[in-house]
């Protein structure tokens, strides 16, 4: 079990008087992550974002294909009809047997910043991002949202898992450019056919991590 995961890090921030009032679950699927975190953060307001049009949830839910541009036409790939695979839908087609039938719908994208402005949403303190390869694109379209954010947990590819999707280094660079530093890990996905293909990394805003740990007195890499 990974000790320094998002639960540990959120507790660390709370013990240092940082508040987590607004949480964005981007790539919410059926809302399981939010259900779990509502137990950890009962006072917080959760906002769920899911691109798959077949999924409808109650509450603060937005069915939108987030990206780095508004009104960009993209193909949104869906799993094969012959299986009940619950996740993986994306405008970057998953490179697996579950997506061999090339099923897709035509959709238009929206920047997270635009959606926030259009709906007068509060800016997030904590973001979970799991969107099957489009995470870097969404971050590029969220420059205003990231200004107030304290923690991001983001799924990142180790091996190419979605066709033509940005790679690990690009995601790290975008987050670094927005003053986020890797601080922990939620999950290592190495269970499918012996391949280590994905990792969920927890990032913390640089100034917060510096205030709590004074990391720059030791580590000069960031």
Regions found by a protein language model. Name each.
Residues 1-222:
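Phosphate/nucleotide-binding beta-alpha loop and adjacent structural elements of enzyme active sites
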């Amino acid at each position: 079990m990974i000790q320094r995961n998002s639960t540990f890090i959120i507790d660390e921030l709370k013990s240092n008087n940082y508040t987590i009032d607004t949480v964005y679950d981007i790539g919410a699927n059926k809302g399981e992550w939010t259900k779990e975190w509502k137990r950890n953060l009962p006072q917080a307001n959760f906002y769920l974002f899911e691109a798959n049009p077949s999924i409808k949830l109650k509450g603060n839910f937005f069915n939108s294909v987030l990206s780095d541009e508004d009104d960009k036409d993209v193909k949104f790939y869906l799993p094969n009809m012959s299986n009940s695979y619950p996740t993986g839908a994306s405008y970057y087609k998953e490179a697996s047997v579950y997506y061999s039938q090339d099923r897709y719908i035509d959709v238009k994208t929206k920047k997270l910043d635009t959606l926030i402005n259009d709906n007068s949403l509060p800016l997030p303190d904590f973001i979970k991002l799991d969107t099957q390869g489009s995470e870097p694109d969404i971050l590029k379209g969220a420059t205003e949202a990231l200004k107030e954010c304290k923690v991001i947990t983001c799924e990142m590819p180790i091996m190419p898992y979605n066709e033509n999707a940005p790679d690990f280094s690009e995601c790290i660079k975008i987050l670094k450019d927005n003053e986020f530093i890797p601080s922990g890990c939620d999950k290592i996905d190495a269970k499918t056919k012996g391949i280590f293909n994905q990792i969920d990394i927890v990032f913390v805003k640089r100034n917060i991590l510096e205030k709590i740990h004074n990391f720059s007195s030791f580590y000069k890499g960031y």
